[in-house]
A protein has these predicted regions:
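Short, low-complexity, charge-dense intrinsically disordered segments
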Residues: 10-19, 28-33, 41
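Intrinsically disordered, low-complexity segments enriched in proline/serine/threonine
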Residues: 20-21, 164
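Leucine-biased recognition of intrinsically disordered, low-complexity hydrophobic segments
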Residues: 24-26
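Nucleotidyltransferase catalytic core that binds NTPs
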Residues: 32-211
Length: 211
């Protein structure tokens, strides 16, 4: 690449199937973004060589079931939220911190790459599910991450049966996927407004405009 600050290679903008050097730049961009945000807010994120703690946060559906049973025995209040989290930004982090404040344990359902494509089209996600999960696992507010392939987290919500289901945006609680599952078990649904001016689409458009 001729310019570290743009997504161009030989004056060509790659929107789909970028060359490996562009992919590596995107990954590094994401890592630097998260680390700088964390430092600015007084958090410590270890560099990759130190990040042995992250793997244990990423669980399979079977593993989350075992973990939930353990937390229930400890009378922990479980919170669940979900999303794509493609190009992590400060709005995501604030949202997750707010969600974590509703209980003791925050379980994050992360849309897989195939799930994101179904929801947002063939040009997404920008970051792979492995990269997204790795970066999210460095956020202290998140206790565990489960990647799911479906378009909605309905099956995962049934497995976790959270005390609090959190959704970002301007939904009515009863319109949120999992509402019936949670409320029938005595739980509740919380709606957290999005942070104005913070979005993955906005970041991508800004980068392309400057390239």
């Amino acid at each position: 690449m001729q310019d570290k600050d743009c997504f161009t290679t030989e004056n060509t903008i790659y929107i789909h199937d970028p060359p490996r050097e562009v992919e590596l730049f995107l990954i590094r961009f994401q890592q630097v973004y998260v680390i700088r945000y964390a430092k600015a807010n007084g958090h410590k994120i270890p560099m990759p060589a130190e990040q042995t703690f992250t793997d244990h946060k990423i669980l399979s559906l079977e593993e989350i079931g075992n973990r939930v049973r353990s937390w229930r025995k400890e009378s922990r209040k479980l919170v669940f939220t979900n999303g794509c989290f493609d190009i992590l930004h400060s709005g995501h982090v604030r949202y997750l911190q707010t969600a974590a404040g509703f209980g003791d344990i925050l379980v994050l359902g992360l849309n897989s790459d195939s799930s994101v494509r179904k929801l947002k089209g063939p040009l997404r996600p920008i970051m792979t599910q492995a990269d997204r999960a790795y970066l999210l696992s460095a956020i202290e507010a998140i206790d565990c991450i489960v990647i799911f392939d479906e378009e909605t987290p309905a099956r995962l919500i049934q497995s976790v049966s959270p005390d609090v289901l959190v959704k970002g945006g301007d939904y009515l609680p009863e319109d949120v996927v999992g509402y019936d599952t949670v409320t029938e078990n005595g739980g509740c649904v919380k709606i957290v407004p999005y942070v104005e001016g913070k979005s993955t689409s906005g970041i991508v458009n800004s980068i392309l405009e400057q390239s």
